[in-house]
């Protein structure tokens, strides 16, 4: 069981090696002002929107 987990971790690490840093930043949203969405009144962090959409579920 432990060997299969190690092999899985190695496979994931190999996949990450194929991703360029610019591609990773684009996928993670790092190029977009670090998660801040500019609005008319102020900058809302993405966590604010996530809370609003998940607070009542």
Curated annotation (Swiss-Prot):
Instruction: Describe PTMs of this protein.
Output: Maturation of lantibiotics involves the enzymatic conversion of Thr, and Ser into dehydrated AA and the formation of thioether bonds with cysteine. This is followed by membrane translocation and cleavage of the modified precursor.
Q: Which residues carry this modification: 2,3-didehydrobutyrine?
A: 54
Which GO CC terms are listed, alphabetically? extracellular region
Family under the similarity heading: Belongs to the type A lantibiotic family.
Provide the organism lineage as a comma list. Answer: Bacteria, Bacillati, Bacillota, Bacilli, Bacillales
A GO biological process held by the record: defense response to bacterium
Q: Which domain of life is it from?
A: Bacteria
- Role of this protein: Lanthionine-containing peptide antibiotic (lantibiotic) active on Gram-positive bacteria. The bactericidal activity of lantibiotics is based on depolarization of energized bacterial cytoplasmic membranes, initiated by the formation of aqueous transmembrane pores.
Q: Where is this cross-link: Lanthionine (Ser-Cys)?
A: 41-55
GO MF terms on file?
signaling receptor binding
UniProt subcellular location: Secreted
What are the residue ranges of the propeptide?
1-30
Thermal properties of activity? Retains 50% of its antimicrobial activity after heating at 100 degrees Celsius for 100 minutes, and retains 25% antimicrobial activity after heating at 121 Celsius for 15 minutes.
Pfam families attached here?
L_biotic_typeA (PF04604)
Source gene?
nukA
User: Which positions are linked by Beta-methyllanthionine (Thr-Cys)?
Assistant: 39-44, 48-56
| Species assigned in the record | Staphylococcus hominis
What protein name does the entry list? Answer: Lantibiotic nukacin
